[in-house]
Amino acid sequence: MKKLSIITIFSMNSLDETTEKVLLIEIVGILEALESNAISLNEAENICFSPYIQKKLKEKKCNPEILEIVERGCELEDIKSLIPESYYKNIADLKNLGLALVGKYPFIHSSFWRE
């Protein structure tokens, strides 16, 4: 079985539904940590919300709805500096989009993290 994280996803040829669901769960976790100030925006960008990550996910034919969340996550720095009163609302909106999308994926039946 495969181990999954945002970094290991880049070594895959394509993304299946399980991989996309795990990616979404990671993204929602990053947004939750960002919203509660457990991580900085810079950390979130280093982990997930960068044009590089977006490009790699697009190359892997990632679900366009996930790509949209990542793209909007890349815009958080601009929002924080230009319209700071909207910053946390945008994080919450992205988190809610991610949660709604996670629910559309099928149940994960395998223990993919074990070898």
Positions of PLM-derived features:
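Acidic, Ser/Pro/Thr-rich low-complexity regulatory regions
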Residues: 1-115
